């Protein structure tokens, strides 16, 4: 049996021979330095499915403060636009009440 295995693996690279001879169950956890450990296909550790709220319940104070400031900033901007409209410095259409001849 050993002779048959030997002739079968002649000429093949070392890691290939080890992969074919040694089963995954026979490789111990401490064989990280061997080629077998690196060559065999390892499953990546699966992350658990997220359950419950993704974000923590407690929002950091800095972000909360920034959100509140932004809210008030936007609210003030809205009130300014509603109640104090800006005068157009360059109106798109000239006022029909004033004709260009009167200005000259």
Swiss-Prot record:
A single Pfam family it belongs to is UL17
Write down the InterPro entries for this protein, in alphabetical order: Cytomegalovir_UL17
**UniProt family annotation:** Belongs to the HHV-5 UL17 protein family.
Give the protein name, as stated in the record: Protein UL17
Q: Which organism is it from?
A: Human cytomegalovirus (strain Merlin) (HHV-5)
The gene designation is: UL17
